[in-house]
Design a protein with these regions (language model features):
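Patatin-like phospholipase
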Residues: 1-69, 77-328
Length: 328
């Protein structure tokens, strides 16, 4: 097993590898120096969808960049394409379709979330993304994936759709229940393993226990960040899912990735601690569910999903003036 210290050192090297990280942000003068950060969490992402729909409806869209991990990357697409309600519609309309997310899909395709169905059929036909609006929006988008070879986060610059949709798929490919996504010679899985809430990358800060800042070539760090998380304030993470992934022995050929899995819970809690410290300093504003979130990874209850969506809307509406003041 590779040590956590070795993984951190490798993270420093890989984070400076331009091939992994994308290109410069837009110099558009109409954008603020505020980044929008979206945590993942499978169907918990419908909370984020509720927040984002209110921001879009109220014209609170002045972000220089959006950074999404897993479901956060999926939500980023509809926010950048200016399609209010799309992310919510997709989760509600297709929750019972076995092609969308099911163990049948896992058995037949190797992915619990059907790649062809989600990233081609829905994306292009059933509830199509407005690619023209996405591509013309100067806000930059980064999808956070985990480089399986190095066990480090990769900040994939989603410049154009439909060309870069596999970057979003890479970000949301959960370990043990998804095939690796190969892009430009790299193998990727869900970004949650290595950077669940990518505020440090956006702000150019050290992440959690790391000794060095997250460096992304040609990216000017944002001054502050609005961060949407999908767990309540008192959430404590266990390592049950990561232990399942390790015991599956799927990743014995990738020791750095196994090390990242083994240390994920500790790093996640360190990350949350850092996040709330930054909120106390005024550099970030965190929006979070007011109560523990009970929806499952493959939630089928439309009532539960709609309730969480409405909770996201309420949080955004209740704090709208605070959000506007923070961004300005």
């Amino acid at each position: 097993m590779v040590s956590q210290h070795d993984t951190k050192l490798l993270h420093k090297d890989v984070a400076n590898n331009e091939a992994l990280d994308g290109t410069s942000l837009s110099k558009n003068q109409n954008t603020s120096s505020t980044a929008l950060i979206l945590e993942g969490g499978s169907y918990r992402g419908i909370f984020t969808a509720g927040v984002l729909d209110v921001l879009r409806e109220k014209g609170v869209t002045n972000f220089e960049s959006v950074w999404g991990t897993s479901a956060g990357a999926i939500n980023s697409v509809s926010f950048k394409s200016k399609q209010i309600g799309r992310a919510m519609r997709i989760m509600l309309a297709f929750r019972d379709d076995p092609r969308f997310m099911s163990f049948r899909s896992l058995v037949t395709t190797g992915n619990i979330a059907g790649g062809e169905f989600m990233y081609k059929e829905i994306q292009n036909h059933l509830d199509p993304c407005d690619n023209e609006a996405f591509n013309s929006n100067p806000m930059q988008m980064y999808a956070v994936a985990s480089d399986v070879t190095f066990g480090t986060p990769a900040y994939l610059h989603v410049k154009s759709l439909p060309d870069d949709i596999k970057m979003v798929q890479a970000s949301a490919s959960m370990p043990t229940v998804s095939r690796m996504v190969e892009l430009d010679g790299h193998r990727y899985l869900d970004g949650g393993t290595t950077d669940s809430i990518p505020f440090a990358a956006a702000l150019g800060l050290p992440d959690g226990q790391a000794e060095h800042p997250v460096v992304i070539p040609d990216h000017k760090p944002a001054k502050k960040a609005l961060v949407i998380v999908t767990q309540d304030h008192d959430y404590v993470k266990t390592d049950m899912n990561e232990q399942i992934a390790i015991r599956s022995q799927f990743y014995t050929a990738y020791p750095y990735y196994e090390a990242a899995l083994a240390s994920r819970s500790e790093r996640y809690m360190d990350q949350r601690k850092q996040l709330f410290e930054l909120q106390n300093e005024g550099r970030v504003l965190v929006l979070e569910p007011p109560e523990p979130v009970e929806v499952k990874v493959n939630e089928k209850s439309g009532e539960a999903l709609l309730s969480l969506y409405l909770t996201g809307r309420k949080v955004a509406l209740d704090r709208l003036e605070e959000i506007k003041s923070f961004i300005e």
